[in-house]
Amino acid sequence: MKAWLLVSSLCLSTFIAALEQTIISTAAESISRSLHTTELEFTWIGTAYLLPAAASTPPWGKLSDIFGRKPVLMISIVVFFIGSLIGALAINIDMLIAGRVIQGTGGGGILGLSATVIGDVFSPRERSKYYGVLGVTWGVACGLGPIVGGAFCQYVSWRWCFWINRTSLPQSSPNPLNLTTSVPVAGVAGALVLLFLEVHTPRTPIIEGLLAMDWLGTITIVGATVMFLLGLGYGGIAYPWNSATVVCLIVFGIGDNRRLRPDRMEGRQVLDHAAAPVQIPPPISPPSASAYIHGLRLHRPTLYYPPAVLSRSCSAPPRSLSGVYLLPVAVTLCVASTATGLYISHSGRYRPPIYFGLVMMILGHGLYINLQPYASWARIIIFQIIAGLGLGPLFQAPIIAIFSLTKPADTASAAATVFFARDIATAMSIVFGGVIFQNRIRAFKSDIEGVVSPELTELITSGGATTASDQIRALPAAARSLVRDRYNTALRSEWIFYTALSGAALLLSVFISKQVLSRDHKMNKTGLDVQEASRLEELEKEKKAAATDAV
């Protein structure tokens, strides 16, 4: 009972963070119209949450190593709450993006630390069962997020996508859905964590702990990630791909991220309390790569664009219905995640679910290439079910594989590795998808301008493709059919790209080391003394390895 209360507190925390990744998918068009955004700004409505969620994961993990999991998780929930408040009060796109950035910073800590706590508390065999529960929580958030976001946009306002995380909603807000004026989602999550999360919490002095942090490494990770994704987002849209701005952002974004170089990842260099001190053996690289491709495949093609695209295929359906379109993949994902957790808990083997998930991802998302510019419901539902069967097992299996190969002191760093890879891939997925789609649709400018007005043609091909759905539905049948066909062709390029990435992940997964998970476990401890002992142990190993090489 105690274990399930603990997991319940983590699940609710995970739910609010995961919900904000998907609730925007059906609200983005309303936000774009309300705040008058360009296509590039539209893309950053989603990326502004996902980017800091990825970049903040390593420092959140290191802070929890120093100060303990519970207080740092509580702080991340508070940060998430503040970001939600700013987003709800946004009067322009800059303020909204600022709120999403703060939200994402807190969300990155919530998701990463929830997984870390399970790794601390439970044995390798038991972890899989509870990670399955977290996977179901994420799946429920995936399913409810677009529906709730669409309902808010249709009946109240997109701002309620942010008010929902407050401990109270404004009394003056319209309430046709008969929702209560008190929605204590973030508040209840924080209270449950405070009451039921019983883990080792060291008494680390605040100043000493902060001085032990690798702030230079933290700034490097955040700065490099932002530069890289800005370069990808600007390429071909705001600036030409060969412009100095785009080239410099991408090159320096990759080059400056020294803290995550492979030599550091493999433990050949050990830094004092580094922001990403993942001294883990090389065999974990394929699981991290699988998690990366999983994140890259998940968000854009499965959760972000289909609601908007499918709504264009129908006769102006309500926005709440476009979220229902995602239920097949969300429900199947939950079932697959639960089954995977039970299988790993029973057998102790994590490689078969990874292989199965990647094969189904290739099949399911490869079938998306066959989607038509009209509502072919048999295709839409069956293809999503197959994709969900592939996505579900990959929520927990890669992190279980990594935890099985790491020391207890490196649990947070291992979780940070997986979630950094997954979150940065999710953010990159939106950027990659936007770049591929926008550049492809621009190639059809001559076709489109022959059937629609020059103004609408320019809107569709020069930055407003996603926000032009109302104008497209108002076109004559022949013109509407041509534009939808070009939309579908542009999206097909995305499906091909993501399917190829899934194949690359399957090839990498072959190199995952084979182990049978143990049922034995000892509670992990945190604090500077534990981290220092682990660091000295790594240094001693390096000295012995160097001496052996010298001989």
Curated annotation (Swiss-Prot):
GO CC terms in record: plasma membrane
Transmembrane segments: 40-60, 71-91, 102-122, 132-152, 179-199, 206-228, 233-255, 324-344, 354-374, 380-400, 417-437, 493-513
Gene3D superfamilies per UniProt: Multidrug resistance protein D (1.20.1720.10)
A single GO molecular function term of this UniProt record: transmembrane transporter activity
Compartment(s): Membrane
Induction / repression: Expression is positively controlled by the cluster-specific regulator ATEG_00326.
Membrane topology value: Multi-pass membrane protein
Keywords linked to the UniProt accession: Glycoprotein, Membrane, Signal, Transmembrane, Transmembrane helix, Transport
Sites carrying sugar chains: N165, N178, N524
N-terminal signal peptide: 1-18
Pfam families: MFS_1
Protein task: MFS-type transporter; part of the gene cluster that mediates the biosynthesis of isoflavipucine.
Similarity-based family: Belongs to the major facilitator superfamily. TCR/Tet family.
Record's protein name: MFS-type transporter ATEG_00331
Classification of source organism: Eukaryota, Fungi, Dikarya, Ascomycota, Pezizomycotina
